[in-house]
Amino acid sequence: MALSSISIFIHCLVDPLPRKQTSKTLPSNHIDFKSAFNVANWSINQTLVSPLSAQCIHLTDEDVRIKERRTRAFKHILRKEGEGSHEVLAMIDAIQRLGIDHHFQDEIDEILQRQYTIPSYYNDNDLHGLALRFRLLRQGGYNVSAGVFDKFKDKEGNFDQKLSDDIRGLMELYEASQLSIGAEDHILDEAGDYSHQLLSSWMTRLDDSQARIIKNTLDHPHHKNLARFRATNFNRYFHMANIEGWMNELQELAKIDFQMVQSQNQQEIFQVAGWWKDLGISKELKFVRNQPLKWYIWSMATLSDPSLSQQRIDLTKPISFIYIIDDIFDVQGSLDELTLFTEIVKRWDVEAVEQLPGYMRACFKALDSVTNEIGYKVYKQHGWNPVHSLRETWASLCKAFLVEARWFASGHLPAAEEYLQNGIVSSGVHVVLVHIFYLLGHGVTREGVDFIGNRPAIITSTATILRLWDDLGISKDENQDGHDGSYVECYVKEHKGSLVEIATKKVTVMISDAWKQLNQECLHPNPFSPNFTKSCLNLARMVPLMYSYDDNHRLPVLEYYTKSLLFESVSI
């Protein structure tokens, strides 16, 4: 059973395989990027930053013209195919998987709107085509009924066994099942189980390359992964599939776009490195994690649109303070000191800061400076001063950290649900997303500010995903000396006789349910901008990469993607 060339391309984009590097002669004064940016510990060698900035990729005006010309050409192809059905959906899927949809968003929106409003499109009896249309529409925010898949069931209400040989259709059905929005989508849960079972069976009967395609689909469904991270191997697979026509056009555009975005990201890292050096926190607070590269990766993944360069730089700053304050609570502060620190942050009492020990004083002053800086930028650009709201998010975070510190100090292990509700706040997700809300500037009105301040479900579902993923990997984290506890630990203690394996399975189900809620919140209509909802999704997508530690307390997959995206070139 062979798979098509397009399937090889689309479904192999997720496989993080090492690429053979093209050898080139480097100047004698060349400095390797990886010598300055250490992904093993996520630190930056400040002495090499200035020399490296001169070696950053600098694209010519001709490069820009080529990209613009290719973009216009493919927009023409999209408009030409827009009246069709299957082919234009395959184009949109490829564009999104390559992470270049920001160039074609207007065209994609127009096509999806047409697909949504023409009922005849749902009469498609081709499983692959219907599942692809369903997934693209759901990803685009359209609340398409999962009942469109009822036609593929038999009289007993089970999926028809005639589908068992349709590998491409089953792969797309599995992809579509990731867009479930809850109990009303029970058919998608059935579809996910059904397609997973059959595809797993097919893996034992296909050759290695085709089995890998299926495995990649099952392990890394598109909706729950970061497109740009997974697209780093597209050169290899275009060559493997010998793809021609419009896919070739996309390949060339994607390679140029990759270089441009990589150059932009490198420049952003240099600015982050300069800010971190000038801040001086790592010298004053030697016990905190010194990982500015990792903190920037959070921003780069969450705010993926190239037009949001300054927002990525600004967002890295509060992300760094989440880690810094976490380390203060987790490994350094006494309970009395932490209580005082939390009270001062709650009041935002700049004068009372002198009561704090030196390391806390340095942290609060730096936090105050960054908060005011971001507040001024938002006010200047969007006409709203968010400082009060930003301070409230920091107070909530510190309060949640303090609750955990008191639990640990007293030896008290809370009930699992109590732990989770506090952990949703201590995850820091609310802090990150509130900053994103203001930095983007969309919907910054009194109603919008009040709504975001009350931690809507789009935030709590994202935070739940992070908190529970973090708990699953807690025994393999960065070997911090403190102790945070975990949902698994609380559940096992609360339910006498429960095994860790049972609790872990429950957590996996809870993560799946949180994803369903997040999917629901991203459907139209919702009160947030597309950039904000995409940021929530991207943050959730980034979580497995950030918390999948190996036995050496490292993040090998994240390290691989960081090198691929930031430091390795793609020849054009």
From Swiss-Prot:
Its cofactor is Mg(2+). It comes from the Eukaryota. Keywords: Lyase, Magnesium, Metal-binding. Gene3D superfamilies: Farnesyl Diphosphate Synthase, Terpene synthase, N-terminal domain. GO terms for molecular function: magnesium ion binding; terpene synthase activity. Binds 3 Mg(2+) ions per subunit. GO terms for biological process: diterpenoid biosynthetic process; hydrocarbon biosynthetic process. Coiled coil: none annotated. It is an enzyme of class 4 (lyase). Mg(2+) 2 binds at D326, D330. Mg(2+) 3 binds at E478. SUPFAM superfamilies: Terpenoid cyclases/Protein prenyltransferases, Terpenoid synthases. Mg(2+) 1 binds at D326, D330. It holds the Pfam family Terpene_synth_C. Probable sesquiterpene synthase. Does not produce any detectable product when tested in vitro. Belongs to the terpene synthase family. The Asp-Asp-Xaa-Xaa-Asp/Glu (DDXXD/E) motif is important for the catalytic activity, presumably through binding to Mg(2+). This is Probable terpene synthase 13. It comes from Ricinus communis (Castor bean). The lineage of its organism: Eukaryota, Viridiplantae, Streptophyta, Embryophyta, Tracheophyta.
